[in-house]
């Protein structure tokens, strides 16, 4: 872990501990070892992004990496830990295996959004990270997803100018991460990890599309993941399910949930 000479050395200790343990965790969780001999984490005094997952040389804004052992509050430590775990997960999702084109950006960012919670919950169970996952970003994601014209998690990109619009924290990050938690819960932890291990082993140093991942999870679980998840990532919005009773039967129906004016929608989602 690196910083400028203006920083005290002890502000690097927390990041070093989290980074070291995160790599060990991912090695075991993914079943595929971190492929490089070293992982550098560099705090930059003037860095517009929060962090960037360059392979083997991750760069951070100073506030996203450095923690004073006496002055930094726990809330800031939790934030720093999730940023480190997020960027390190990209060493697998994004660097070891890279999406074929920008329409599958979610293969990088949705997974990193989920894995930062998976990793830090395992490393710091006393922080109860899944409580944060259930509240952080969710309201913004639901609000954004209820607007007409919002992009889907997997969105077409036909021109380089469209790439930057994909980095929507409410959709590709927050919504996508929670859809992955849905499929993880659906097929179970063992099948999920088996599918990921197969995915990394088969596609290491290659490019993939979303269906490559769904196929590995489908093979590992025996469940129809491809059709299920493509419906969720390829269409914008979210369903609201209504229940009505008729004599002794319950009738369930769904429609896309909107806030404000909107065009009619016939979108349907398979509910796992």
Where are these regions (language model features)?
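Short coil-to-beta strand junction motifs in C2/discoidin
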Residues: 263-272
